[in-house]
Amino acid sequence: MSGGDVEEYLRGADMPEEYRRYYSSLSGGTYDIFEKAASAKSNLADSSGMVEPKIAVDLSDRVAKMHDLDIAGPLRELLATKGKELAALMLAKEIMDGKYLPEADIEKRIDSAVRVGLAVVTEGVTIAPLQGIADVITKKNKDGSEYLSVSIAGPMRSAGGTESAVTMLIADYVRRQAGLAEYQADSLDDETGRFIEELRIYEREVGSFQFHVLDEDIRAVISHLPVELDGVDTDPYEVVNHKGMSRIQTDRVRGGALRVLNDGLIGRSKKLLKRIELYGLDGWEWLAELKGAVQTGENKEDAAAKRMREVITGRSVLSMPNRLGGFRLRYGRACNTGYTSVGFHPAVAEILDHTIAVGTQVKIDIPGKGATVAFVDTIEAPTVRLAGGDVVKIRDVAHGIELKGSIERILHLGDMLISFGDFLENNAQLVPSGYVEEIWKMDMEAAGAAQGSPSSADEAVRISRELGVPLHPRYLYYWDQISHEELAMLLSPLDKGDAISYPAACKPVLEKLGVPHKAGPEGPVLEGDEARIFRELILDNPPGPDASAPVPELISRSSGITIRDKFSTSIGVRIGRPEKAAPRQMRPPTHCLFPVGGTGGPTNNLLKSAARPGFSADILSRRCPGCGEPSISIRCWACGERTAVERTCMQCGTDVDGEECERCGRPGLAHSRVEFPLKKMLVSAQEKTGVRAHDPLKGVKELAHQDRIAEPLEKGLIRQSRSLTVFKDGTVRFDATNSPMTHFKPSWIGTSAEKLRELGYETDVDGKKLEGPDQLVELRMQDIVIPLEGAKYLVSACGYIDAELDKLYGAPPFYKVPDLGGLIGHLVVGLAPHTSVGVAARIIGYTETHVCFGTPNWHSAKRRDADGDADSIILLMDALLNFSRHYLSDRIGGLMDAPLLIQPLVLPHESQSQAHNIEVVKRLPPGFYEAAAARKKASEVGCVEIVKSRLETAGQFGGYHFTHGTSSLTTSRPRSAYSTLGSMLDKLDLQIRNANLIAAVDAAEIISNVISTHLVPDIMGNLRAYARQNFRCTACGKSYRRIPLAQRCSCGNGLIQTITRASVEKYLKLAKRLVNEYDVGAYQRGRIHALSDEIELVFGKGGGDQALLTDF
């Protein structure tokens, strides 16, 4: 689509007028920047002379431009009438029939048909269709019949398990249309046995798959597949018993093909059956007979418990599954949760020394596997025991900070807010909800009352008695979690006066209940509201003994006040990855993509290389016909004339005028190692930019692209002057953890209401004019709020772009951003590492967090959720001006994490289903809680409005609601302790301190898990690596598998070990300390001592253990 086509499309679309203007502004801004970048590059100051990323508006546009086929219009029509799945097949058939490639042979048409079909299914976002499929070719069976073979490469992983398996379905459909025979497995060799051996080698030597599958399933799949599943080798491990097979070109493991087999065809077999029915394919009925994915013999609950046991040193366990005192499940969504982001009360972070922060990844047991942290202060806060024995319910963050230093035990962590949409996405079973304020309000409405929450216990009791509604949750304790014997203990207080006192033996029961109380001289003392509630519930009319009835029912009968269960389930939570907000850098960090070979030292220093006489580089052979100087750019750096690429025949060595040698027919080689005037070019670049190079100016060792195309040195100089580094594709990037946001307040993002009105935010969610900092506003589809650190980095990047436009391209500056405020309103692109499409976004503010806030639809357009991953943010002008495919590797996977396409608009109906499953209601209806009480699957609940129900209407763009409010996004610190603490010992100390502090965590069990899942495997792995280590040159960095006889590098310098005794033993002293201090069992203790003995056998007796700082 052109800019005019986009405007026409927007005029005809069903959307609110403000969104029409919004989208028009985004697309207009994108095309305007594209034109400016194209104008700048037309002066030929770099190696491409043109803007390389293509603008693709929708799915059809992306697929067409990814494959350079004129299919956008037909595909758009097919999508409108047939849907994505059937459109993929129908378009594949048309391509195979030659409608769009009339001059191509049958193999080329089949290849394109399969790739384009997969591109449609994967929404034209991932690189899987281009590089995940290595080849689609025809081969011959033993009987001479032709069949279809699909060769899979590593990048197929980016498509996802189901979509990667759908590749085989599309290939089978195309095979039938082409009239090819079925693949006959094992007709020449034992191909099923090869796959079984290969898959087990991969699991043992390379890594695990998402699922574990049975040998019999592998045998069934390979023997029944109508299309051959082949692949390119991805890892250096070879099969032993199935080498030299006639139809398999490699003896090494084929990771891409194995993943399609394991995680796709077998692991997603049930999902594939639905696709097969939709496609109308026969011959795949055998999929129904597979056992499918198994969790190594465990049921779902065991698998979740196993995830909780996989504890990493320094990453705390906050709550163990189904432990009273752990995080109680609370259903609902805040404006900053959902889409796999879960809500915690911010006081939890404060009292746990900021073990968690916004964006910290947590591993959970329901409804999915991972999530990120968000803070919501309208859910239940923790209940704690202080050093003096008092039990206190924390009121708010300030109260938590005040109490932090005197907390002895966290008795109850409070609530964890989880979206219904997360349960729906995982099709998880709902669990009954505890009695919470939302249900109480519905009970009040059912009773015909509209009163707000009670302000005191007296009022709560009165409401319950007069209206017959259950006691308000604020005055409800965990009665459902105590025994009849414990209840009997509470019926006999020492004093029933204004303050109720109990003997010391009752204190554990009161703590279990979560009742705030004072520590008196004889035992716990209840005062105020707590004393009033106890008198009303159990003391004035004591419940009689009845072991057959639950405790809440006994109390309800005797008191006349209905008591509901406060506890539902507690969720297992452990820390995963810390939040991330940092510049994206190459390793080592690089200023300029210019090769120095081995002359630049460990930092690839261009200045060091330039000082060497006769410097040469393996670089594109581009030379000026006028002055004869070698050049990087199309226009000569010395005289300004247009340069030409010199090609040489690889076979006969003659100069080649075109792409191929006329004599040999071989392609001409465009690069060679030539003497290069690096020093003169650096001097010229410094004069041109007015920037002086500082030591070290970092280049790269070698260039990745087959033509060895380098960047102009001017870019590296300007980047260095602004403390920026370059990524492998020529762009400057900042990475930040993904986090969802649907609404915000101006005060949260540091942007004034006046500035927001300029950006189109005229009103708040209530339709009132936006004037104040605390009005709630709905976030637009492609507006983002970025980390403050990222904003500062991008301001520097703006200065770099402007200097580059001025000094290198001779164009006027574009950004002219003097400070952070000037960045507001500018366009960027978001890019996930496994994709090749940058999604446009507009910056509207900053937060002191380490996350990038955006709508679920925007994150979904990048094929991401908020489970802890980080994506890149790139200035749109940077992506258009500086990105080049010619900097990227030609190897398989080289095009991943590159903005080949720019998507200016995010259309909700094109988002992934996960974004469509988000609830958009002000409250969850009674029917939902009834379904939860019945433990129904989330997919069986139809009474909750989700985004999916609004698709193809104006309501899909906005008017979303949420169930729980919050007054702020963050806490007093923007980063988690894991990110800020220095040593692993400090992190472990915090982990142990948290385990001892939280009642829902068993410290000894955590230590045992740390030893078994982290320390022991790490020590064993390091010991194994020591035996296999390489040796490295201290000067040039060259690596040797074995030490040469001369015991020196080829450059003459010495060699050193890459793994030392210290690195093998780094956790041994720590492990010894842990097994001695904690009751981890004889087995764990024996393992550590056995490892210690083994290390001494390898290295000899040490000179004594190195003391730890914590030993003093």
Swiss-Prot record:
Annotated keywords: DNA replication, DNA-binding, DNA-directed DNA polymerase, Exonuclease, Hydrolase, Multifunctional enzyme, Nuclease, Nucleotidyltransferase, Transferase
InterPro entries assigned: PolC_DP2, PolC_DP2_cat_dom, PolC_DP2_central_dom, PolC_DP2_N
Superkingdom classification of source: Archaea
GO molecular function: DNA binding; DNA-directed DNA polymerase activity; single-stranded DNA 3'-5' DNA exonuclease activity
Known EC number: 2.7.7.7, 3.1.11.1
Record's catalysed reaction(s): DNA(n) + a 2'-deoxyribonucleoside 5'-triphosphate = DNA(n+1) + diphosphate; Exonucleolytic cleavage in the 3'- to 5'-direction to yield nucleoside 5'-phosphates
Nuclease in keyword set: yes
GO terms classed as biological process: DNA catabolic process; DNA-templated DNA replication
Complexes and interactors: Heterodimer of a large subunit and a small subunit.
Family (UniProt): Belongs to the archaeal DNA polymerase II family.
Stated name of the protein: DNA polymerase II large subunit
Species this protein is from: Cenarchaeum symbiosum (strain A)
